[in-house]
């Protein structure tokens, strides 16, 4: 059994620090379209296909991404 625990985002907008914590915890979550102050957090499946993406400033970005992290997230070992 793995000692890895899921890392989730707040339900609303999220910071770069929070996004980096998620990308560090999951193999298939990436920061893309980085504009400095805003960026997208992207979840891809094992084949590399896009599953979901949200801008960090969207009102319910974390809530949407957390749902996909629970079903599609691949935790690092």
From Swiss-Prot:
Belongs to the UPF0401 family. It holds the Pfam family DUF905. This is UPF0401 protein c4569. Disulfide bonds: none annotated. It comes from the Bacteria.
